[in-house]
Amino acid sequence: LSTRAMLASKLLFALIILGTTWNLMAGYGGLVSIGQQAYIGAGGYGVIKLADVVGLPIPVAVVAAGVVCAALAIPTSFLLFRLVGGYFAIGTWVVAEVFKLVTQELPGFGGGSGLSLTAFQGVDRVTRIATVYYLALALAVLVVLATYVLMRSRVGLGLTAIRDDSVAAASLGVAVRRSQRLVYVAASGGAGLAGALIAVNGLRVSPDSMFSVQYTAFMIFIVVIGGLGTIEGPILGAVIFFALQQLLD
């Protein structure tokens, strides 16, 4: 592939990850979140700290940032799951704003101006673009495959039942809350991976860009247009969204 094609495709892979993980949470778990930008931002800032401060290689730092975001989602879920329906959705947005404010105030995170990634210094542009491209491609494939395997498992059958009727699923012995927490944590980890890819692609992060609610708008559009509650829906939606963005840009 040409360098120009790689540059464009990296965004597509990040969109596939975001759409697939949001669909897992909303399309199967029945959890409509409008605050996943909390973990996109955390993943973006996390990968820079892990690469520049800790010294991890970029691919390892990206994966580690996703794991950190999944870990952050566990305690956060115990707060959010006290809310239901629209209150849950608004609660996730509040959490995202809290993440943003905390990031701005923490020392060493650049305040309102953000941080720059220095781990790629000395690496030529073509190599950097190719590295991020193949990393994004690999992660997008792994996320889709992991979602497919999950939905073919016992947990996936329970999630399908929850999607159709959570009350009936609970009456049949499905652990509704535990299953929902699982997909929330998984989706947050996926958002962290996408945020880390966005950060290493742009080489810079700031609170306003990384914690922007536009990412949630992108995810909702991708899933709705592609097909909510299907494996292939987010992929189709991401391709349509990406094509429209390229044509209208």
Task: Annotate the PLM regions.
Residues 1-249:
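Transmembrane alpha-helices and adjacent helix-loop boundaries
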